[in-house]
Amino acid sequence: MEQPSILVKILHSIPHVNYTFRRVNDTFNPDSDVYLEPTNNKLQCQQKGIELQSLVILASIPAGLLIGSLLGLLLYLLTRCCDRRQRKPSAQRCQSCSLVIITLMTCAAIGLGLYGNDDFHNGLLQAFGSGKSVEGLVLTLKRQTESIKHDLETRMAGHKVEQLVEKPHYNQTVVMLLIETSRLVTENTSRAVASLDSMVHYFMKAKGSENDTSLMGLLQLGEFYESIRWPATLAFLTVLLLLCTVLVIGVARRSRCTLIFFSVSGLFCIIICWLLAGVYLASSVAAGDFCMRPHDYMCRQVGMRSPYVDFLNCGTPRNRFILRLNESRDLVDRARESVEHMQRMSQETYPHIDIQRTLNAMDNDLEITLRNLTTLSATLDRRTIDMHYEEALRGLCGGGLLGLSLMMVAGLLTSFLLTILVYADSHAWIYLTKRPTLDADKSETAPLFPASNAPSASISPTAPLSTGTINRTLLHHQQASSGGGSGTLPGSGGGAGAGGGVGANGHNGVGPYRNGSAGLRQGLASPSSQSSHTSSTATYNNGTTSYHNSHQQHNNHLYSNHYSHSNNHYNNTQHRTNPAAGAVAAAVGVVSSGQRSPSPPPVYDLVHGTRSGHHTLGRLPSHHQQSATYLPGPNNGKYATLSKQCKTLESNDFY
């Protein structure tokens, strides 16, 4: 037998202690029934029970680490869950890099577990294959033994030599000798059949107890558990790899939901990993104890009348099957010698046609039986069983133990690294700030003026004070009013001389500006002082009155009255403007003493439809809501907008 490997020695050297931390016997003895049986040998029972306790204590070490890690995570979450202080970007980047590096290390540990799982599976399959070979050999021996027994019993009983010998004859001495020899042949044949029957009896029973199972039953049970364990372990390790992938994606996208999902899922995976690590640790130590002295454990099964280890050299003088087989063969040889002796005696006493034919048939049958027993003896050679036994040990204590040890190491590493990942991930999503979207339009939310010089006056006619946003629809209206083709407002007559005309080329009037901001600048600001602001307002009132009279004459529509009402409201608003509004207007407007202000924008409620409780996205209300305000022309009287929402302008739009 080969010497134990270094791995077997390392696993066997792990201390076996009881709950008092005293070293105990490390001999492999996994029979739990023996542990629970009350025996007279109290010391032996205590040693066996303590050995089982040592394996349980080894398995409880990862369980203790699991409890400690869960308590630490609970304390961390209780102390840090309400801490919302903003962390520096450099600290967040370092944390993300650490998460990715630890995740890669965890994936490597999981890969080691996958490799060990495959090695352990292949080793068990090799051991199961060798066990099936031994089982097949035993079944073959059983069938051959039954066949030899049946043939010997039936053929020898069918010859009926005694009836031929008992016929009346003048030489009674020869007759008595022939009858005695015939009975000796029958007796030897019966004893040979009894020996073969005892072999069949041992083949039929694996152990003496009725609760014991055969080797084939153990192999089938082991294959059933392995068919569940191998794919389940493979699926669990694959799930761990997927969770690591989810964590990397969550760190890359800075997704709080993904990181929280990993924290919750990783918590359950930590529990399973630590428990599996405990099972692998105890199993590896037990396998190391078995592989250290496997022959001793197998030979102990001889006392339990296990026929499968009876072929091994366990210190017994000879194999019991070989003994029974040799006994049967010797008895058949004696029966054959008796038949030959009967043939010699019957040649002179009985006619050849009467008894010689029967004796020759008996001799042929005994010769065939002897030949079959010789073949069976070669099959029972211990070298064949030893070959399968060595293959089974090589698969179990070689690749199988290596795979189990790798799974133990991978389980411990994965549990430890996964615990760190859950800690770091919980720290990440607690302090993680939501990253702004890349496609967000800053111009939609940026203020009109910076906070340092924001005006206190409202841009929109009906907007509250101290707001710095303006509707893009109002800009379109003012641009259309100020950028017309005529130099004076319609119906103003000599407005050019009184109020300062607006030239077509924009030299003295309002020309086209970038982003349509000319009307806005002149519609919001007065030239220089409060007096000029008052005069400009008066001029604006005269111009707008003339404009609306002319507009009423051409269109005859209800909208002109509403528009005049909005202009008057806008003029009153301009009269109530505080001095701060004048400062803002001076900063934004165009400084000219004789310029005419453009037409004021429509009422804010009319444009946005806020009176009816609906947001019309910068357009006039529909004609079915207010038929009187319906206007003919393009777009049904609605103002075209560049976006569906209000556009907040920046300072770059004006300068």
Swiss-Prot record:
It is found in: Cell membrane. Keywords: Cell membrane, Chloride, Chloride channel, Glycoprotein, Ion channel, Ion transport, Membrane, Phosphoprotein, Transmembrane, Transmembrane helix, Transport. It comes from the Eukaryota. It is a multi-pass membrane protein. The chain crosses the membrane at residues 55-75, 96-116, 232-252, 259-279, 402-422. Residues 1-54, 117-231, 280-401 are extracellular. Residues 465-480 have a biased composition (Polar residues). Residues 446-576 are annotated as: Disordered. Residues 482-509 have a biased composition (Gly residues). Residues 76-95, 253-258, 423-655 are cytoplasmic. The keyword Ion transport applies. GO terms for biological process: chloride transmembrane transport; chloride transport; negative regulation of locomotion. It catalyses: chloride(in) = chloride(out). One of its GO terms (cellular component) is chloride channel complex. Disruption phenotype: Death during development. Probable large-conductance Ca(2+)-activated chloride channel. Modulator of embryonic movement. Belongs to the tweety family. This is Protein movement modulator. It comes from Drosophila melanogaster. The lineage of its organism: Eukaryota, Metazoa, Ecdysozoa, Arthropoda, Hexapoda. The gene is Motor.
